[in-house]
Amino acid sequence: MKKIVGLLAAIMVLSLTACGGGSEESKATKEHVYRMEEVSIEEVEDKNTISDYFLREDTLYIIGYNWMEESRETYIVKKKLDGSESSMVTLTLTNNQYMGSLTVDDEGNYYCVLNEYFEDNSDPENYVWEENYYLLKMDGEGNELWKQSLKGEGEDSYYGVNWMKILGDGRIAIADAYGLTLYDTQGNVLKKVKQEEDSYMGDLIQLTDGTILNMSYSSENNKYMLQKMDIETGEKSEEYYVPGISSMYSYFPGISHDLLLVSNVGVYGYNLGDEEVTELMNFIDSDLNASYVYSIVPVSETEFYGMINDNLTGNTVLMKFTKVDPKDVVDKKILTLGCNGIGWDIRNQVVQFNKTNEKYRIQIRDYSQYNTDEDYTVGLTRLNTDIASGYVPDILVMDTSLPVESYISKGLFEDLYGYIDKDEELNKEDYFQNILRAYESNGKLYQLVPSFSIFTVAGKTSDVGAEPGWTLEELNEVMAGKPEGTLIFARETRASMLQYSIQMSSGQFINWETGECKYNSDAFIQLLEFLKQFPEQYDDGDYNDEFWRSYDSLWRDDKVLLSISYLDGFPSYNYMKKGTFGVDITLKGFPAEDRNGSTIIPNLDLVMAAKSKHKEGAWEFMRYFLMDEYQNSISYGWPLSLARVETMAEEAMRTEPYEDSFGNMVGYAQSYFVGDVEIKIDPITKEEVDDVMNFIMSVDRPHTYDENLINIISEEAAPYFSGQKNAKEVADIIQSRVQIYVNENR
């Protein structure tokens, strides 16, 4: 990537968008746009060594750490904002020294907590560990001015520093396990505030008006709590709770607001006592190739500095952010992408699409923003409600918890085959045909799954046979021939097995296309009987030290028959066969009447709204995930592209170091440990690759997680598990309730 030089360089010219006609959506995309300017730090070659920075008046202080073989160093780059001056101070430390909480005062002096330790383990019976802490002050050149020892209350008591801050009046505050200590600029102790037994000295935030806040986690409310604190007495008052999920934010002092809050969506303003946060900057609307901004320092109501980790380069970058006047944001047609949480691959492609597409712009509507500390499902519920009401975003990132069959039966999604067939750069034959078929409905493709994993059950071939698929009767026959005490699965409860059974074999009991349900069938009654043998919960006493010492050999030693397995690449199969089991295995699947108990878990699942007004634009975005550029970038999970999987197979079979498809030198090394014994695992063979490919191509059932369905079955099956009703009685009740549920949601 081209390096950009200058104090404030790399100005990103934003081609940002709005819908025509002045809609609320287009207005929103314009209101929260900032441009980014990279702060050039020529003195630092490896920007990823930067850890923090401070702004004092017109000067930036950038702090970083380098680790050498025999020593380590801390560097401080001092840079005027106008570029007129720039210099660097390097502080060399020994390997047993560490500088923490490094900061700078208004005069340019540096303060830190210096940790020095000594270790001698040459004599195991006389292990020596000594550790000392100091409050250290240095001048602008890094010369020591004074050093104050920091200790606990007792001679042998453990000591550690929670944080060190310079207060607005110049005093230094240090919080430790014993409370708060205030020092003057010469290192003299001014006051000690003892921490009460029922109180916790959390982090300290100084607002621009001088107010000091203490932030700590409230176990009573399961939220982060802000309290005003009297620094002289340590007394706290006036509790405040940020709306939403408080843990998703980082907290910084603001100018136009008491606090600036940063999430992976953007930057928000918050005034103490407000019931809502105010969005200031949206990362996607601003074309920011990063998921977070760290260490925000505001300069004005419309400017702030912050550090990012660039998603494209992986580099740490110090940026200046400046609000863009909405009238200067370029108009484009708006596409809405809905999701319940967003992955980095989608996020990056949205940013790239928005930068390069001259006609369309994507706005993300992430429903996870509605979740709260009290209820993490609010967003998913709201998304489902919107979809059921007919409001479907132009592009939707599906979640396995959503009732996709219900949506398809209502005609909410667009058939994608027509777009693929007309696309001159795409050929359906280049992809796993069974995966495409799995997401068809009546010959139409409504879901695009460009990457996936396989959820299955594995067992020794000598136990379960060589062919995939089996029934509960066949599993019971195998178990009947095993010694008493043999487990079917390791550490699985009745509830977890119920979930697995619904996720991996529910297709045999519901047909969403016809609405037919079979929960009063003999097959389902047998499933209930199978589930009853699993414990409601395990006693921790069942898992003593001996159990955990032998855990890695449970399958090898035939103490456990089966392993629930996520097959996400050739290495995972190789590890499972040659490590977990140590012999030939069969990917058997969960027992099911139709012998089809393995499922496809989409790593990404995209759909297009049937009523979208911008289908051409939606497809322009979606097609990228079928292109070689994306398919060849997949390293976790299975790509849809057969050619990419062939390359992955070739790499997995290599025994010598090689350069992978990402340009990295890779040396094969895979091991399995049984206790302290290391077992070297040979690379996968061509025959094993063929076995894996044949299995993958045989799987044609999508993985689902229908919480409503699981809840119905769990509630109604409980009387059977407790002995109050027989299996047939509860099966009839479940059949009735599920049939109503299906009828209402088709």
What does each of the following model-derived ranges do?
Residues T514-W548, Y575, I585-F590:
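Glycine-centered hinge/linker elements that transmit conformational signals in sensory
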Residues Y407-G411, Y417, F432-E473, R491-G515, ...:
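Periplasmic solute-binding protein
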Residues I600, F662-V738:
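C-terminal capping/gating helix-and-loop segments adjacent to ligand/active sites or protein-protein/ligand interfaces
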Residues K577-R654, M697-S698:
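Extracytoplasmic/periplasmic substrate-recognition and gating elements
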Residues R361-Y431, E440, D552-L562, K578-G579:
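Extracytoplasmic "Venus flytrap"/periplasmic binding protein-like
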Residues G20-E70, Y75-K79, G83, E116-D120, ...:
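Conserved N-terminal structural module of periplasmic/extracytoplasmic solute-binding proteins
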Residues Y417-D430, G507-L528, G579, G589-T599, ...:
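Short, solvent-exposed loop/beta-turn-alpha elements that line the ligand-binding surface or hinge
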Residues E116, G160-N162, N384-T385, P393-D394, ...:
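A structural signal for short loop-to-beta-strand junctions that line the ligand-binding cleft
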